[in-house]
Amino acid sequence: MEIFMPKLRSATSTQGRNMAGARSLWRATGMKEGDFGKPIIAVVNSFTQFVPGHVHLHDIGQMVVKQIEAAGGVAKEFNTIAVDDGIAMGHGGMLYSLPSRDLIADSVEYMVNAHCADAMVCISNCDKITPGMLMAAMRLNIPTIFVSGGPMEAGKTKLSDQLIKLDLIDAMIQSADKNVSDSDVDAIERSACPTCGSCSGMFTANSMNCLTEALGLSLPGNGSCLATHADRKQLFLDAATQIVELCKRHYEQDDYSVLPRSIATKAAFENAMSLDIAMGGSTNTVLHLLAVAQEAEVDFTMADIDRLSRIVPCLSKVAPNTNKYHMEDVHRAGGVMAILGELDRANLLHHDTKTVLGLTFAEQLAKYDIKLTRDEAVKTFYRSGPAGIRTTEAFSQDCRWETLDDDRENGCIRDKAHAYSQDGGLAMLSGNIALDGCIVKTAGVDESILKFTGEAIVFESQEDAVDGILGGKVKAGHVVVIRYEGPKGGPGMQEMLYPTSYLKSMGLGKACALLTDGRFSGGTSGLSIGHCSPEAASGGTIGLVRNGDIIAIDIPNRSIQLQVSDEELATRRAEQDVKGWKPANRAREVSFALKVFGHFATSADKGAVRDKTKL
């Protein structure tokens, strides 16, 4: 019986007499005679000098290229765009952040399919780059390994003779607090972001890079090993070597188990979401996982997230949910593998799912969970720590903690019996104001306000909300409603980090709630409820709220209700139908590119992906 092996995709442009022109062009890129017939592997880099999470990636792409070629492949590098959400925050630039995710996915698809690449190493890091590349990987379904740029070291400075840890969010909050002196604000600003890498807390970038480990698409340690540490160099080299091995297994041995869709199954998405809930990750991960699942044609929905959020405990609290721990502390405690290990011991992990190492998670945890491993090299790897030296250079230091943090009772990562809470770090709420659900990061909510009822104060834009908060219009007991900021209504679904930060700086962090059809930065904490679906621009009930309406929030019972009668809501809906569901008195310049995004965008419960029914 004749066996037909998968043919190299690149053979389309490298084999046969009629491809002489294409081969001539390949030769002009540096390919030699012996290279034709080898797998062509795309090194998908995202270097830019605009973003600290990517500023150190310039030479890393070529390092990966050389290692791929040493392992027997042909490597070709290209770059994607990368938006820094922190720099784009608080002005019109934030409208472009979420749309950039889809643009990145499209651009990777375009480059890889146009040039018939056989596999990818995706070098991502910050908020929309990792999910955009994940979406592309699922579309393309060719051998792919993710290796990110790594987390930033936590900032440290002395205030009132006390050494404190800092991050970007501290700079935002303290700068708006009139009780903080100019000299202290200056010290915080200069110390909050000391190195290259993705911001040092469990914000969106680090959350997503951790989730690539749980999906099985990156190597152990990818989510937590610092950008500045020499150990991270080996992750890049190992990824480069392993991608050639995956190509051999697929194209020479007919092994389809190495493909992204075979690895990132429904069970893998559940593992990733369970990790996110356990570590109190960014609410943006919900949006992105839903989008990636759709590209993978996996039936993973808000209902699955709701189910998992009710059974998975909160096993790790990291900034912004606490000031005590940052990503460098998560790594010292064993990183993602340690959290997954605790989930496995609690029977909350599908440990038969596969990874890019060709192992099941049960096998991978046996080697990489610091509570199980006998490999001293693994333990040494997880002792890698910060140097405390300002730098934009990758792999520039090799400092190590003297000991690991393997305390599962009182340490950074806990076991289920000693969890920060038996209720997980994320929750989906639903009710008449959010028929398709909304998301809250419960790990960042003070226990005193898990149930909250208050009067609505409504704003038609983030800008108006900021003015209202800083201008004293928002009072204790208010539910701040910011609407028409969803994927369609923004358009672009801005992050509401400044409103939540300013509530804290005004002393209202535990005295108010915030509800929006927009989204939040991974740096947000407090009673901040986002992704309200359907959004106002799509006829969602959030568009019917009026000042003074009572909104009741009950996180333990996963409920959020607008206490207005159905009859009154029907009357308001009829009025709004006539008005066309547009924000009142909002002056906002919207480019053609953003209008196109808004036209096709679905609400957050669908991942804000494009509505294919409109094609």
Swiss-Prot record:
Q: Its GO CC terms? A: cytosol
Which cofactors? [2Fe-2S] cluster; Mg(2+)
The molecular function terms in GO held by this entry are: 2 iron, 2 sulfur cluster binding; dihydroxy-acid dehydratase activity; magnesium ion binding
* Active-site residues, record numbering mapped to chain: S521 (proton acceptor)
Q: What is its EC number?
A: 4.2.1.9
**Pfam families found in the cross-reference section:** ILV_EDD_C (PF24877), ILVD_EDD_N (PF00920)
Task: Using the record's annotations, give every residue carrying the modification N6-carboxylysine.
Answer: K128
Keywords annotated in UniProt: 2Fe-2S, Amino-acid biosynthesis, Branched-chain amino acid biosynthesis, Iron, Iron-sulfur, Lyase, Magnesium, Metal-binding
- Please tell me which top-level EC class this enzyme sits in: lyase
* Matches recorded under InterPro entries: Dihydro-acid_dehy_C (IPR042096), DihydroxyA_deHydtase (IPR004404), DiOHA_6PGluconate_deHydtase_CS (IPR020558), ILV_EDD_C (IPR056740), ILV_EDD_N (IPR000581), IlvD/EDD_N (IPR037237)
Q: Which reaction does it catalyse?
A: (2R)-2,3-dihydroxy-3-methylbutanoate = 3-methyl-2-oxobutanoate + H2O; (2R,3R)-2,3-dihydroxy-3-methylpentanoate = (S)-3-methyl-2-oxopentanoate + H2O
**Pathway assignment:** Amino-acid biosynthesis; L-isoleucine biosynthesis; L-isoleucine from 2-oxobutanoate: step 3/4; Amino-acid biosynthesis; L-valine biosynthesis; L-valine from pyruvate: step 3/4
Name the GO terms of the biological process aspect.
isoleucine biosynthetic process; L-valine biosynthetic process
- Residues bound to [2Fe-2S] cluster are C126, C199
Q: How is the cofactor bound?
A: Binds 1 [2Fe-2S] cluster per subunit. This cluster acts as a Lewis acid cofactor.
Q: Where does Mg(2+) bind?
A: D85, D127, K128, E495
Quaternary structure, from the entry: Homodimer.
Protein family membership: Belongs to the IlvD/Edd family.
Stated role? Functions in the biosynthesis of branched-chain amino acids. Catalyzes the dehydration of (2R,3R)-2,3-dihydroxy-3-methylpentanoate (2,3-dihydroxy-3-methylvalerate) into 2-oxo-3-methylpentanoate (2-oxo-3-methylvalerate) and of (2R)-2,3-dihydroxy-3-methylbutanoate (2,3-dihydroxyisovalerate) into 2-oxo-3-methylbutanoate (2-oxoisovalerate), the penultimate precursor to L-isoleucine and L-valine, respectively.
What's the protein called, per UniProt? Dihydroxy-acid dehydratase
Q: Which organism is it from?
A: Mannheimia succiniciproducens (strain KCTC 0769BP / MBEL55E)
Q: Coding gene?
A: ilvD
